[in-house]
Amino acid sequence: MLRSLQHVESHINQCRRISTTSTLLKNRAGKTKSTSNRTQLLTYEMAQKPHHIGVRKSWLTWHSQNLEEFRQSQPLVVAQDEVVRRFIRGFFPQNLVVSGNEIVIKRRGNVLIVAGFLQYSRRLDIRRIYWMFGFAEEFLSILLKQPVKLELSFVESEETVAYNYI
């Protein structure tokens, strides 16, 4: 009995050293799935791989949150970002490009900068656009108690922003 137990133990130890299973290749994080008829729009930022975030997309990562004077707690930053995204989606509902996913929120010192693209509609006149920008900046500044600057660009259509279709 003792001999058979030793045989089983040596067999288990040998199995631990050699792996015979195939790899599952489940390292596809951040990769967008392609469609059968290439209808899904990709912008330049969406087309980049996640490991290029610090190289090709570094302008998205410049922030001042690690400086001692401007440090904020993580839940506060996440809540502020969600408030800004929901406000922009609600205030410019007909003008959003790529369903509002391309809104970039940057923090430089005490200033919150919101960048992105809006689709130009023929119904908007220039006075209304300036009023909407001014109101949005002022409302978000009062709500978040820090200066907010909008850097939103208007494009003719979503195809202008498209980098690739998959």
Swiss-Prot record:
One of its GO terms (cellular component) is mitochondrial small ribosomal subunit. Pfam families: MRP-S24. One of its GO terms (molecular function) is structural constituent of ribosome. Keywords: Mitochondrion, Ribonucleoprotein, Ribosomal protein, Transit peptide. It is found in: Mitochondrion. Its main location: mitochondrion. GO terms for biological process: mitochondrial translation. InterPro entries: Ribosomal_uS3m. It comes from the Eukaryota. Residues 1-25 form a transit peptide. Component of the mitochondrial ribosome small subunit (28S) which comprises a 12S rRNA and about 30 distinct proteins. Belongs to the universal ribosomal protein uS3 family. This is Small ribosomal subunit protein uS3m. It comes from Caenorhabditis briggsae. The lineage of its organism: Eukaryota, Metazoa, Ecdysozoa, Nematoda, Chromadorea. The gene is mrps-24.
